[in-house]
Curated annotation (Swiss-Prot):
Coiled-coil regions, chain positions: none
The EC number(s) this enzyme carries: 2.3.1.234
GO cellular component: cytoplasm
Protein name per its UniProtKB record: tRNA N6-adenosine threonylcarbamoyltransferase
Residues the record lists as binding Fe cation: H111, H115, D306
Cofactor(s) essential for the protein: Fe(2+)
Catalytic activity annotation: L-threonylcarbamoyladenylate + adenosine(37) in tRNA = N(6)-L-threonylcarbamoyladenosine(37) in tRNA + AMP + H(+)
Gene3D superfamilies reported for this sequence: 3.30.420.40
Native species: Protochlamydia amoebophila (strain UWE25)
PROSITE patterns for this protein: GLYCOPROTEASE (PS01016)
GO molecular function: iron ion binding; N(6)-L-threonylcarbamoyladenine synthase activity
Compartments, as annotated in UniProt: Cytoplasm
Enzyme class (EC, first level): transferase
Length: 343
C-alpha cells in the first residue's frame, strides 16, 4: 500500500510517501527556522501563512522524488493534532481535498504517536512488546507504555514546559539563536556541569511526571541580578558555557532517572525514543552509562524532527487496525491524548 503523509503541526511543512509502513520512497520537509529565528520562537500566524505557500509544492516534490502520481496513492494520512490550530487546518484540509478528489481513504494521525513510530521505522527489525516510549520534543514530554502499535498507556508527562521548550527558553535567556537545543548542547561541551546546582522539579505523589518550569526559573536567577531582574548581568563566555552545561545536566539526568524508573516499574527492557531532543548526544550518553543492559531504540537523524514519513508509516498501520477511512468531519485538535485503537 502506498501512503501519502502530510505533516503541518507546527513550523515544518512536510510530505512523504511510504510503502507498507516502512519503505520510505520520499520524505520532503520544508523548514521555517529562518522565518522564525528573528523572533526567538515560532509565531503561529506566520507559520500558518507559510504552510499555505508551501503545502502544494512540497506534495509535488514528494511525488516527483518517489516517481509516482497522485492516482497511484492508496491512502492519505495527515497529522490532525496536537499542534497549532491554524497550521493543523492547512494540512488537514489539504488531505481531505485530496481524498475527496481522488476518492481515496484518509486517516488522521496523532503527532506524538508518530514520533514514537519514527524509531520503529528507523530500525526495521521486529520489536518485543511491551516497551517504554519516551517522547522528548519542543511541545511534548511523556512516558508511554507501548503494548503494541495502537495500544498505549500514558504513565508520565510534563505538568508545565516540555523539555525542548525549556531548552529553547534557556537559550533565549543566554542570547543564543533559535532553535536553542543544538546551541545549548554545543556550549555545554565546553562548560562545567557541576558549577551550578540546578535541579528539575519533582511532582508530589507522581514520580514519573516531569516539571521544567522551576529549572528554567533557576537559570534565570543565575543569569540576572535577583534584586533587579530587569537588569542583565554581563556573562563571560565561560559562565555561559557553565550555565548551559549545568542546565543540560539537570534536564537530561531527570529524564534518564524517570525513564529508567518507569522501565523498572513496568518490567520492560526496550526504550523507544521520539522527538527532536533525542538528537542530544549527551542525553544518549547518559542513558548508556546509567544502564547498558537495556535496549535503546533511537530515531534516525532524518526522522527525529517533525516529518511526514512517520505520519505516512503510522497511517498504514492505523488503517490496517481500524479498517476504515476517517470521517470528513475529522477536526484538528490542539491537544489530544494518545488513543488506543478500539478492538
Amino acid at each position: 500500500m502506498l501512503v501519502l503523509g502530510i505533516e503541518s503541526t507546527c513550523d515544518e511543512t512536510a510530505c512523504a510517501i511510504v510503502r507498507d509502513g516502512k519503505d520510505i520512497l520520499s520524505n520532503i520537509v520544508a523548514s521555517q527556522i529562518d522565518l522564525h529565528k528573528e523572533y526567538g520562537g515560532v509565531v503561529p500566524e506566520l507559520a500558518c501563512r507559510r504552510h499555505i505557500d508551501l503545502i502544494i509544492p512540497v506534495i509535488d516534490q514528494a511525488l516527483n522524488q518517489a516517481k509516482l502520481t497522485l492516482e497511484q496513492i492508496d491512502l492519505i494520512a495527515v497529522a490532525n493534532g496536537p499542534g497549532l490550530i491554524g497550521a493543523l487546518l492547512i494540512g488537514l484540509n489539504t488531505a481531505k481535498a485530496l481524498a475527496l478528489a481522488l476518492r481515496k481513504p484518509f486517516i488522521g494521525i496523532n503527532h506524538v504517536e508518530a514520533h514514537l513510530y519514527a524509531a520503529i521505522m528507523s530500525h526495521p527489525q521486529d520489536f518485543q512488546f511491551p516497551c517504554l516510549g519516551v517522547v522528548l520534543s519542543g511541545g511534548h514530554t511523556a512516558l508511554v507504555l507501548i503494548k503494541q502499535i495502537g495500544q498505549y498507556e500514558l504513565i508520565g508527562q510534563t505538568v508545565d514546559d516540555a523539555v525542548g521548550e525549556a531548552f529553547d527558553k534557556v537559550a533565549k535567556m543566554l542570547n543564543l539563536p533559535y532553535p536553542g537545543g543544538p546551541e545549548i548542547e554545543n556550549l555545554a561541551r565546553h562548560g562545567r556541569s557541576v558549577k551550578f546546582n540546578f535541579k528539575a522539579g519533582q511532582v508530589k505523589g507522581r514520580p514519573l511526571d516531569f516539571s521544567f518550569s522551576g529549572l528554567k526559573t533557576a537559570v534565570l536567577y543565575a543569569i540576572k541580578d535577583p534584586k533587579a531582574l530587569k537588569e542583565m548581568v554581563l556573562l563571560s563566555s565561560e559562565m555561559t558555557q557553565d550555565i548551559a552545561a549545568s542546565f543540560q545536566e539537570a534536564a537530561c539526568s531527570d529524564i534518564v532517572k524517570k525513564s529508567l524508573l518507569a522501565a523498572k516499574q513496568y518490567g520492560v527492557n526496550t526504550l523507544l525514543f521520539g522527538g527532536g531532543v533525542t538528537n542530544n548526544c549527551y542525553l544518549r550518553k547518559l542513558f548508556s552509562v546509567a544502564n547498558s543492559n537495556l535496549n535503546y531504540i533511537w530515531p534516525s537523524a532524518g526522522l527525529s524532527l517533525d516529518n511526514a514519513a512517520m505520519i505516512a508509516g503510522l497511517g498504514y498501520y492505523r488503517y490496517q487496525l481500524q479498517n476504515k477511512s476517517d470521517s470528513m468531519d475529522l477536526e484538528p485538535l490542539t491537544r489530544t491524548p494518545l488513543q488506543s485503537v478500539k478492538e
